[in-house]
Each structure stands twice: as structure tokens, then as C-alpha cells.
């Protein structure tokens, strides 16, 4: 007998967006009857170092999801944003059963899937060690990290086109976490 009747979503965040950034989304899903569990930050646990193609992060997700499935008694639906979507897909492919339950499904949100010549071009760029200079991780490493205060951070991000349409609470969660 399941320990919970609520469907279980294991959420994986995108690059530079800790799990807590998605609080508004999580609250909305919880209000609709889902359990939401998420790793707060991929790439920060020394047991799961970041390497090419993220096998350790996939294992971190599998280990986390297995524990949550065992606790809830429900199969996991793996949902991920950007990088998290890739991790979710790779996790389901490598671990179709988590915590003794078949994975319920995978949902990738804004994960740029490449195929054909684009995938081959990326593979060549990785082998030539060019990817590190143009990847989202390289871009995020160049971001400003020090501010005089929270109001300065809010003003900065509100003025950016990429953040202009963000819900106010989502922006505040992004800044706080």
C-alpha cells in the first residue's frame, strides 16, 4: 500500500537556478495535489563531481529519486528545467526503475535537445575543448556575484530583458537563493 496517494514529482533545476528558485511553481503543483521533491543544487556535492556528460549528476538524481520513491511509495515523474531536463531524461534511460518503482514519466522544460549535424558539431567542439568558453556554465561564471544590497540586485535584474517578464516572487526567489 502506498505511503502517499499524491503523485510524486522529482524536479531537477537548470544551470544557475537552485531548486528554491522554483518555489512559485512548486506551490502551484502542490496545490494541484502533487508531492514535489528537488535537489537544491547540482554540482555542489563532492560525492557527485561535475564531469563531461554529467554521469555523476545523473547518479545523484537517481540516488535522490530512489530515496524519495521509497519514502512516498509512489513512482516518480522526473521533471527538469534545461540542464535538469537532460539529467531527468538520462536518469530515466539509465535507471528505468527507481526505488523499486518504474519511472512514471519524464518532462523536459526548455532543454535544448540537439540532433543531426548540430549534435556532431557540439561533439567536435567538446573534443576541441571549445565548449567551455561558450557554454551556459561559462556565461554564468562571468556574472556579477557581489552587490551592495538586495535592492541593487532587484533593480539590476528587473532592467534585464531576460528577467522583465518574471513573476516578482520568482525574481525574489532567484535573488535569495
PLM-predicted stretches and their roles:
Residues 11-14, 82, 111:
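Glycine-rich His-Gly loop
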Residues 140, 144-177:
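Alpha/beta-hydrolase
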Residues 24, 90-94:
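Active-site signature of alpha/beta-hydrolase-fold catalytic machinery across serine-
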Residues 41-79, 93-95, 99, 113, ...:
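Active-site loop/oxyanion-hole signature of alpha/beta-hydrolase fold enzymes
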Residues 80-84, 88:
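Gly/Ala-rich beta-loop-alpha elbow adjacent to hydrolase catalytic centers
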Residues 7, 75, 104:
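Alpha/beta-hydrolase fold active-site loops
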Residues 101-145:
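Flexible "cap/lid" loop of the alpha/beta hydrolase fold
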Residues 3-47:
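Conserved HGGG/HGGXW glycine-rich cap/lid loop of the alpha/beta-hydrolase fold
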Amino acid at each position: 500500500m502506498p505511503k502517499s496517494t499524491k503523485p510524486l514529482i522529482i524536479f531537477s533545476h537548470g544551470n544557475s537556478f537552485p531548486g528554491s528558485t522554483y518555489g512559485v511553481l512548486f506551490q502551484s503543483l502542490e496545490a494541484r495535489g502533487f508531492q514535489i521533491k528537488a535537489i537544491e543544487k547540482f554540482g555542489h556535492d563532492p560525492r557527485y563531481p561535475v564531469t563531461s556528460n554529467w554521469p555523476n549528476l545523473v547518479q545523484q538524481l537517481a540516488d535522490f529519486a530512489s530515496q524519495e520513491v521509497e519514502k512516498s511509495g509512489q513512482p516518480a515523474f522526473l521533471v527538469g528545467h534545461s540542464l535538469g531536463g537532460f539529467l531527468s531524461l538520462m536518469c530515466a534511460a539509465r535507471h528505468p526503475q527507481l526505488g523499486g518503482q518504474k519511472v512514471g514519466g519524464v518532462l523536459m522544460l526548455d532543454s535544448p535537445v540537439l540532433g543531426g549535424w548540430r549534435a556532431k558539431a557540439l561533439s567536435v567542439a567538446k573534443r576541441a575543448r571549445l565548449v567551455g568558453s561558450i557554454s551556459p556554465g561559462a556565461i554564468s561564471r562571468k556574472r556579477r556575484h557581489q552587490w551592495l544590497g538586495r535592492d541593487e540586485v532587484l533593480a539590476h535584474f528587473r532592467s534585464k530583458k531576460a528577467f522583465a517578464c518574471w513573476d516578482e516572487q520568482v525574481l525574489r526567489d532567484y535573488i535569495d537563493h
